[in-house]
Amino acid sequence: MHRAVAQFEAESQGDLAETRVKIADPFLETLRLKTAHVAHQDGMEQLADGLTLLLRIIMHRHGPNKPAGGMPHPASYFPLKRLDFESLRHKRFFRSAAAAEWPHSRPVNIGRYLKSRQKTVDRALDGYLPKANVKPATIHKAMRYSLFAGGKRLRPILCLAAAEACGGKIANALPFACAFECIHTYSLVHDDLPSMDNDDFRRGRPTCHKVFGEGIAVLAGDALLTIAFEIVSRAAPTKRYSMATFLRETAVAAGSRRLIAGQVADLEAEGKRVTRAELRYVHENKTAAILSTSVRLGAMSANATTRQLAALTRFGRALGLAFQVIDDILDVTQTSEKLGKSAGKDIAAKKATYPAIIGLEASRVEARRLTKQAHNALTLFGAEADALHALANYLLEREY
């Protein structure tokens, strides 16, 4: 085992063009069990990551004597071809971590789940927004252009998953899910403006102000924010939560003490040296506020108990912070084509980010820590929270 790992490490540094390692069935089984055990021990994450990656490579490199439907024959060999280590670094680090952070939930086909929920949210959004030909057509076209630009719909999907975790119905949570997608999109439209981040691309295509002009983009953002409250007003109150509570939660999350507060702090931090606490304030408000409140309102739509709401609030807050740390990492590790927006813009604008303050590796560790915190917040729930666990892992592993 030591020899195999040593050869793999040497190859990953580019010292060997090709390595052939003879592996027997007992070794594979031992490695699998050891990886599963080590991955749960505090302070051993890096070893678990290495073992997990090695096992994956072995399992996908079938030797010439592999019997049909079985493990490779002991006499088989597995070519470990030279790896582009840097291209695998982000995916390997987070995927192996995600697999270990919460092993107790049942597997969820996250691709199928996201696609299904995205369709549900998009149908509802299409019904809530005025059609593109409704007068004044320009503003409604601009709203729809930005809203239906192919976003991942993570906030509304988390809202729906939170409702299901509390035993609620998707239909009751949909108004909140759609409202917070409108608020999120409004913030992006305004964030891309020349007076803010001055970005030309969003979600893989020209930003709203590049297509419709700056004035219409400002108004489209305003309209998306205000229609969010109209959509919330269509939700049904529950025994524990009134319409006033729904509207107040929405207003606070999008207002000057949360989302706007984060935007202001972000602008004021440009070009300055900020502390980690100051950066956390930006992330808590600019990103985590909307994400965590969408989770809270999903729970409220299901008439969540006080304990359930508190647990999901902790989950949403930790996940929102992890989401932004990953965003910071992706800005310096991915291409514009991959992200669908301008890569490296945070560095160019001298923005405060986790990689800039604590470094890339420490940022990855922080993202994992926050994701684990999100998983731990869900211990109150059983299988009904499997989708939330899967979504947390998905956000940790994402590459754009």
What is each stretch, according to the model?
Residues K119-T120, L129-T379, A383-E399:
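Mg2+-dependent prenyl diphosphate-binding active-site environment of isoprenoid biosynthetic enzymes
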